[in-house]
Design a protein with these regions (language model features):
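Histidine-/acidic-rich catalytic cores in large beta-rich domains
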Residues: 1-373
């Protein structure tokens, strides 16, 4: 009689992949019934696969005004339009909540230009079909063009009339999209093939080799560096970091737009929620200058708010005192944390488990997004 045992310390990627394949059998059966045209292009999905019509919030207003607001500010709002059964991006004027423009490009046409024979995108025409696709972290540029992705998907750019300009499918892009000082774009990606250190340690598919990626406005990758490599090369972590399939989960890259006593222009602040750290990194020298740990967990959205402070969106998924999310301010002079508008956030039962954004405006007020309460 033979027996099977699990050996401590061995990375069980193959077992995990087999388990995932078994779990996906019902979904793969469902895929077979998706409607296609003569070119084998998916055009619509089953009626049974469409999202249910939401009636719970039909009587509620889209926005609620709590105080008078005469700020001349525009909000870039990606949302799912239940009537159109697709994702759109609205440009909303906050002083009166009027939608002054909407982006909604042809998702099916874009998907048909993507190489589905690439293992990273073989299910894209199903997973990111028009009825499922979501615009993530759209960035509006000065000429009205929009750069976005669908989360772990190609990066793309459309014009103000929603015409597709370019697609980059070299990597899978995810989370934040930020403008650099030279008008390039910083965006997280997942590298495959893996970076050198990761590739020498792992040969199975399924590891998330998250990287900082700089993309030109023409869609070309100018710079890419694995965050796992950064941490290992700077001796902050060792190879044991790679024993977890998603050790980093990079969700924000914040470039420094100016010099200060505490950072240099073009330095980067990286949010790494899996290890509950903000890493201060200098790409020009491949050096981690500092890494910040503190009273935050599963954080999102690090922003530079002054010449000596950064804000951190603390999702606050700790084992204790986790009822509300917080916006923390870290002071580089005092090396201490404080909370921004915490009383108001608690009064409004502010909590988002794994997502969310915040923006501190020039007048000191703050805009927060509660994404999954």
């Amino acid at each position: 009689m033979s027996s099977t045992r699990l050996i401590p310390g061995v990375r069980l990627f193959q077992i995990r992949n087999i388990s995932v394949s078994l779990a996906e059998i019902p979904f793969n059966i469902l895929r077979l019934s998706f409607k296609k045209n003569k070119s084998d292009e998916i055009i619509i999905q089953n009626n049974s696969d469409k999202p249910p019509e939401l009636v719970k919030h039909k009587s509620k207003s889209k926005f609620e005004r709590c105080i008078d607001n005469d700020k001349d500010i525009l909000l870039v709002l990606p949302r799912y339009d239940g009537n159109k059964k697709r994702s759109v991006v609205d440009i909303v004027q906050l002083k009166d909540f009027n939608v002054i423009h909407t982006y909604e490009h042809d998702i099916t046409s874009m998907n048909n230009q993507i190489n589905i024979y690439n293992s990273e995108y073989e299910n894209l025409r199903v997973d990111d079909s028009e009825i499922r696709f979501e615009y993530r972290h759209p960035l509006i540029l000065n000429d009205g063009t929009l750069v976005s992705h669908g989360e772990s998907s190609p990066l793309f750019k459309i014009d103000v009339c929603s015409n597709l300009i370019w697609i980059n499918q070299d990597e899978r892009f995810h989370h934040s999209i930020e403008l650099s000082n030279d008008n390039s774009i910083w965006v997280p990606s997942s590298m495959y093939p893996y970076s050198t250190i990761v590739g020498n340690y792992i040969d199975e598919i399924g590891f998330f080799d998250d990287a900082i990626t700089k993309v030109s406005q023409d869609g070309e990758i100018l710079f890419i560096k694995s965050v796992s490599e950064i941490l290992i090369e700077n001796k902050i972590k060792d190879l044991k970091l790679l024993d977890v399939y998603d050790p980093i989960h990079l969700n924000d890259i914040q470039p420094a737009k100016f010099d200060s006593s505490y950072w240099k222009k073009n330095d980067l602040f990286l949010s790494l929620p899996r290890v509950n750290e903000i890493v201060y990194y200098r790409p020009s020298t491949n050096k981690v200058i500092n890494f910040i740990q503190g009273p935050f967990s599963w954080q999102h959205d690090v922003d530079i708010t002054s010449d000596y402070e950064i804000s951190i969106f603390n999702n606050n998924n700790s084992l204790t005192d986790k009822n509300h999310s917080e916006i923390l301010i870290y002071n580089f002079e005092t090396k201490k944390f404080s909370k921004k508008f915490n009383k108001s956030l608690v009064e409004n039962n502010f909590k988002t488990s794994t997502e969310g954004l915040s923006e501190i405006l020039d007048d000191g007020s703050m805009l927060v997004e509660e994404q999954n309460h």
